[in-house]
Amino acid sequence: MKLILLVTFSSLYGCATTHTADTGAVTPDPFERANRSFYTLDDSLDKAILKPIAETYAEITPTPVRIGVTNFFDNLYYLNVIVNSFLQGKLKQGVSDTARFVFNSTLGIGGLLDVATDIGLLMHDEDFGQTLAVWGFESGAYLYIPLVEGPSSVRDAPDIATSTLLNPLTYITGVVLWPVSALHIINSRANLLDDTTIRDEAAVDPYSFTREAFMQRREYLIHDGELPTEGYEDIFEDDDSDSPALIIE
């Protein structure tokens, strides 16, 4: 079901640039026909089932409660962040991430409160796909994995296994598992409602928009927000124009 969460929207980052790196090729999508079919399936399920439930949840659930729920699940996922910080050779960050997890798991009442940020232990976003990128693996073909992941790639797909194995929820059995998992899905989808609306209103082709936004956000994460300038074309650049430059502060 993670896909249905991500099918809605990966990220708005990067939509102000045109990627022309190296050969100038667009995102490799040799499986586009199958990917589009999977996207359509997820989008249909989302609109028919998950989105209405998430909208109701967002309306009736107080914001502080939703923040606490989000913090709780972010904290559970953070073991994956810690491991991949170390695997990428970010030792100082790995120690900070470990301390963040310990503080939020204890003083933060199981992660419901984000006390770590208040004391300067900032949240990071690392996963095995980023680790493979740091190790030199290319992204490979774009993949859309229905029901469990959503936008992905050949390089990012293995993170499904590693993030699952490192998530404590994986080892919960019995009647507790299903309601907790359902809460995670619904809360995550509710957090994406505004982004979904923007995507649907702005994109002529939501599939392509989702794909390009995902791939550009992955580049952003891999480079820790410091993207290389080579290979990116400034869409505002026009050497033949006499118009004054637009300055955004």
Describe each model-derived feature in a short phrase.
Residues 2-12:
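Bacterial N-terminal signal peptides
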Residues 75-150:
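Mid-length scaffold segments of soluble, non-membrane domains
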Residues 69-72:
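Beta-rich strand-turn-strand
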Residues 17-23, 135-249:
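A structured, mid-to-C-terminal "fold-capping" secondary-structure block
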Residues 30-63:
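Post-signal-peptide N-terminal segment of Sec-exported extracytoplasmic proteins
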Residues 12-33:
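Bacterial Sec signal peptide processing site at the extreme N-terminus
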